[in-house]
Amino acid sequence: MKNEIKYLYSDLDGTIVSWNPKTEFVYQNKSYKNFHEVSDATISAFYRLQQKGIKVGIVTGRDYCRVLWLEKQLRTGLPTITLDGAIIFYQNEILSQTYLDDRFIEGINNIVKRFPEAAYKLNSGWISYFTKNPSVIFEIDYAFLGYFNPNTKLQKKFIDSTENWDLNKLKVNQVYFDIDTCPLAMQKEIIELISVSDVNAKIYEHSMYIIKNGVSKASALQSLNQFAIPITKDNTIVCGDGDNDIEMMQWAKHSVSLIGSNPKCFALAKYHTDSVDNDGIANWIEKNLLC
């Protein structure tokens, strides 16, 4: 197996980044959990893989503001796939991006005008458009933008929920709602709009995010061939734990999941390892790719 592998792509949260980090960082006099915390064992394993000639990349549902610093820490050499495949970044440029249809964004615009208290963001390339409404989720985004990315192309801008958006200028890769700020009537309208639109939505306890239908981590990995990166399902191993990793587990010949993962993701993976808090991925790499 190890002689086949030329590329390794790993998810972040729950895979190599713990949901319970041990460290914090301080931004504007407030402490935040450091979801950039990666163990020394993982950093070492990734570095030694690359020394061996196996290239390493990140594939995540995160916004790039929560990834860019990790690229440097892990010294990745492949394009970074963000927003579950909606944007691919490489060498400080956008390599590829997929937009939601203008008609869908117009529908979202009409809904938020009726519920101006809701907190959400529109991800658009290097720019994240936020409302000014209070949100625990987006407050953390502000902190990550300000603390880890002060001198990058990443930008934070604010959008007015009461205005008609200029869809000739506003091209959106992802819509992300803080569900805790959205009235039930609003949530119902959003779900109804989703049901008649060409979109893919992930709905969790506190959040909902929406990207173009057909876009996934797997589709993004497959698209890298058009950029002269000869990734195939046979020469790539993927690591993941969540429901948004299922399609890439189905695509790749070689896949690793961890104890504590989404049950379907875990069942689909070819190989299994210990939990993220016990350095599962690093240990698996040591035993199977660096031996």
UniProtKB/Swiss-Prot annotation:
* Required cofactor names: Mg(2+)
Q: Where is the active site?
A: D11
Q: What class of enzyme is it?
A: hydrolase
List positions binding phosphate. L12, T60, G61, K217, N244
InterPro entries for the chain: Cof, HAD-like_sf, HAD-SF_hydro_IIB, HAD_sf
- Please verify whether the record's keywords include Metal-binding: yes
Per its UniProt record, what NCBIfam families does this chain match?
Cof-subfamily (TIGR00099), HAD-SF-IIB (TIGR01484)
Name of the protein? Putative phosphatase MG263
What is the source species? Mycoplasma genitalium (strain ATCC 33530 / DSM 19775 / NCTC 10195 / G37) (Mycoplasmoides genitalium)
